[in-house]
């Protein structure tokens, strides 16, 4: 069937900032999608349209984007009479309607809300679960793969008020036998970590950050890794749970060097690290700790250091700000051999079709693909269906804490239950899940 109405409204994300929610109506019902928003955003991302009216919502209103959906998109999309099952036709139509390279006219936040809501309508039209529809759109093979969750349990960088330069310290239960067991392991380590931090740094160090992780006031990144390993050991899961990091290095890149004390306005330039120094530091961490994945190790345009590190890294090297889920940036990264995995964030590119293409291009290049939330989230669970539909085998959507994070993990538990024996858990093969 076709779309009879497209309606958007302004809602609030998990940080209390306005964001866009879209509802698409067909004769099968009303289908809703909420759009997330990032804090550390790559300069190459599609444009999130904000009103910029300082006196309203501190400039963060999205009434322009909402208005674009309710007028231009609603009128044109209904008139176009496209089938909701044909996701590519709908997304191409939206891209042409916008007409800009980075979706700045209508706003990537407006377009993505429509794209995801249409995809949910398409699944209902076919009478299949959302993840099955996505698998069809991507041409995914069977069996379905349930992802290894990467729980961001210690927060630093732009997400936290501590001195830590690196943004995320994650645990990945690769040794679990199923997704539900991975949830059990992750939550137990999370609670153990809370105790460890409380004993060492006091009660207020266990306040949680934007993604549900803890932000103890530590300065040395290695201390973050120590805390993880201690908690894993105390919980009894050494060997079963690995460690991952998101350094978000673009945030501490200054004049060609890296400042690990970037939150201090008077940091000492003589302590800034070169790309080689930073590479050595990462390799020293990888030698001491069970690190399986490092994301955004260098600045988003520091291709040289990316490629140099990727040439010798035996762990997963994930591009996020580097690649911004953009097929053109991904092609450049493949050509330059800059990394070996993609972080997939639907709102960096703005349509489901382009997101699927980004995943397929990356998988074709032999890369891993990790599906990701943003730090400003909603209760929308689309990425749970996307990670299963695309068989990427890994997802990061925060700590096992805060309902906007658990919404995704809980949806994956439901999908696991529904699939039963028809699905496998990626486990230790998370980097090559698409080959399973």
From Swiss-Prot:
EC number: 4.2.1.11
Cellular compartments annotated: Cytoplasm
Chain positions recorded as substrate binding sites: 159, 168, 295, 320, 372-375, 396
UniProt enzyme class: lyase
Binding site for Mg(2+): 246, 295, 320
Principal subcellular localisation of the protein: cytoplasm
Domain of life according to the entry: Eukaryota
Any one GO molecular function term: phosphopyruvate hydratase activity
Protein name: Enolase
Organism: Cunninghamella elegans
Lineage, highest ranks first: Eukaryota, Fungi, Fungi incertae sedis, Mucoromycota, Mucoromycotina
